[in-house]
Amino acid sequence: SVGFKAGVKDYKLTYYTPDYETKDTDILAAFRVTPQPGVPPEEAGAAVAAESSTGTWTTVWTXXXTSLDRYKGRCYHIEPVAGEENQYIAYVAXXLDLFEEGSVTNMFTSIVGNVFGFKALRALRLEDLRIPPDYVKTFQGPPHGIQVERDKLNKYGRPLLGCTIKPKLGLSAKNYGRAVYECLRGGLDFTKDDENVNSQPFMRWRDRFLFCAEAIYKAQAETGEIKGHYLNATAGTCEEMIKRAVFARELGVPIVMHDYLTGGFTANTSLAHYCRDNGLLLHIHRAMHAVIDRQKNHGIHFRVLAKALRMSGGDHIHSGTVVGKLEGEREITLGFVDLLRDDFIEKDRSRGIYFTQDWVSLPGVLPVASGGIHVWHMPALTEIFGDDSVLQFGGGTLGHPWGNAPGXVANRVALEACVQARNEGRDLAREGNEIIRKACKWSPELAAACEVWKEIKFEFEAMDTL
């Protein structure tokens, strides 16, 4: 019977193809699959490939009218995960034609849209994606990228400094602007709206934008440096978001901000296009990421969300701090930090990078280290992240016993001391505390900050021991 054979059949007959040679144009995905008891890994891997491409649960007539061979996803390799029982990495190749050009939204809908609720799987995690150059080229990417940002700001040879204004909710616009001014005046490059500051009853967005712009211009005039404040343009509708970005541009400020996961990729890409067309930098916050990436066996790893952001567009993105965490976590964080900044990243499983990624001159994104860091961390941060990064100290600035401006001074002095020491060839990993202590001698602001937060034990070795 050559004709149509109705009924349910195993996915692996069609979608498990271990001898498939991947093409340069394929989008490759690495899934961590935990099958239900009794489900063979090949069937589970094939189910993932089917469900993210042409598959459905039963044989259908219209399959006869489709070139399955051309359009089906293929599970081309499966390997057990070392040290985990009944867990596998399934590699899936999906043909380029399955995706709409320039749409991160469509890419995610296709690759992770349905399959995560699949009954045959106990859990599923998307660990990495290989975006082929042909697909990368359909995206605009970051509005400006690292080099253009440095030129706009006229700041070179060091990481940039930021500060999230706290308390995140409850300040009036005028008091908020005052805190912004003090931090910038003290020596920071940027201040930041908190991710949940949008436009609430106690502070409407337009008032905030106005007072922050005033703070920026006053600080610029007094310091002779270019300053910025990440004005959060995230809103309930795309139209409102663009309206806020337009107002920011009219005020002449350098940068706006967006929560790209809660706002959604479609909104984010629209905003990124607007920002490039109008010379605004775009700072991206990853609110909601832990909902998606925190579980080890289910969800989507942050490195995939980071790649997606580079395609959708953003000039900065929050990417963890590394400091004081475990060594392995450090390697993995540095892996996706490189994916954000570099043009070409080699496959390296020890850093969680499953595929070689070629970004073909898509602009890079500055990683932002933010959360629970203070002056004693500065040598470690300078060592780990290097020059192309933004270091953000919220409480580490506003918590200074003498006030906001001295808080900013302490951070700037600590940073300049670390950068100078590094440039002189000193070993920040070993001499970090000493470098900070020495700088305290000529900066009372730094000395006061060091007193409050005390020395921390550096739980890290020099970079070159890897």
Swiss-Prot record:
PTM sites of type N6-carboxylysine: K192
Active site positions: K166 (proton acceptor), H285 (proton acceptor)
PTM annotation: The disulfide bond which can form in the large chain dimeric partners within the hexadecamer appears to be associated with oxidative stress and protein turnover.
Catalytic activity: 2 (2R)-3-phosphoglycerate + 2 H(+) = D-ribulose 1,5-bisphosphate + CO2 + H2O; D-ribulose 1,5-bisphosphate + O2 = 2-phosphoglycolate + (2R)-3-phosphoglycerate + 2 H(+)
Residues at which Mg(2+) binds: K192, D194, E195
Co-factor binding comment: Binds 1 Mg(2+) ion per subunit.
Domain of life: Eukaryota
Keywords noted in UniProt: Calvin cycle, Carbon dioxide fixation, Chloroplast, Disulfide bond, Lyase, Magnesium, Metal-binding, Methylation, Monooxygenase, Oxidoreductase, Photorespiration, Photosynthesis, Plastid
An annotated Gene Ontology molecular function: ribulose-bisphosphate carboxylase activity
Keyword Oxidoreductase found: yes
List of residues binding substrate: N114, T164, K168, R286, H318, S370
Positions of the record's site feature: Transition state stabilizer: K325
GO biological process: photorespiration; reductive pentose-phosphate cycle
Gene Ontology terms: cellular component: chloroplast
Co-factor(s): Mg(2+)
Pfam families in the cross-refs: RuBisCO_large, RuBisCO_large_N
Name the record gives this protein: Ribulose bisphosphate carboxylase large chain
Organism: Averrhoa carambola
Gene name tied to this protein: rbcL
